[in-house]
């Protein structure tokens, strides 16, 4: 089955107000730039967003804050966005901060059909408040629940027409997990090759988890913070 699309509307026309979206990427690396821009332009609102972070003021998920399209975000780091800071302090957005490893495991559990699991991470901190806890072998654990979403919006380096994906470097971090835990996955890629061209050992995410593939013409790949040194 050829999963390649040339218009994101074909893949995202069913996305509606109040949906939960799982957005891949780490910082600004490996984010689905085109899907985020689509949501921004369509004005879809009251979204529940699950992502490692929330972009910056004018790029990535940060642009969805401009029109207050995000109702709730589950993330592990949100410190690079002034608009986000303002909305959080004013009670305009619900924020659930989650340890990075726990967030990854919540998504993995969702994709694997595991409803919940116990972890020692967060015991004795604010993270544990309101969560069930149990002791195993003399050590305390808290119950974490799996995360699933209506749409998984991800970015990969290469795909074949069947949706088998190859990621590069840091982009492999949360993108596969967001695909696995979503009902519908839309993958943005830089290159598409015919089915059978990818070596099976090269594939990072099987196409069974991907419903749509969209080839971006030009990804900005912005650097969050650029540090240079003086010429010697």
UniProtKB/Swiss-Prot annotation:
Oligomeric and partner information: Heterodimer of a subunit A and a subunit B.
Binding residues for CoA: 24-30
UniProt-listed Gene3D superfamilies: Glutaconate Coenzyme A-transferase
Record protein name field: Succinyl-CoA:3-ketoacid coenzyme A transferase subunit A
Enzyme Commission number(s): 2.8.3.5
An MF annotation (GO) of this entry: succinyl-CoA:3-oxo-acid CoA-transferase activity
Protein source organism: Helicobacter pylori (strain J99 / ATCC 700824) (Campylobacter pylori J99)
Keyword Manganese: no
Record PROSITE patterns: COA_TRANSF_1
NCBIfam families, A to Z: pcaI_scoA_fam
Entries under InterPro entries matching the protein: 3-oxoacid_CoA-transf_A, CoA_trans_fam_I, CoA_transf_BS, NagB/RpiA_transferase-like
Keywords for this protein: Transferase
Pfam families (alphabetical): CoA_trans
Name of the coding gene: scoA
Catalytic activity: a 3-oxo acid + succinyl-CoA = a 3-oxoacyl-CoA + succinate
Span of the signal peptide: none
Family: Belongs to the 3-oxoacid CoA-transferase subunit A family.
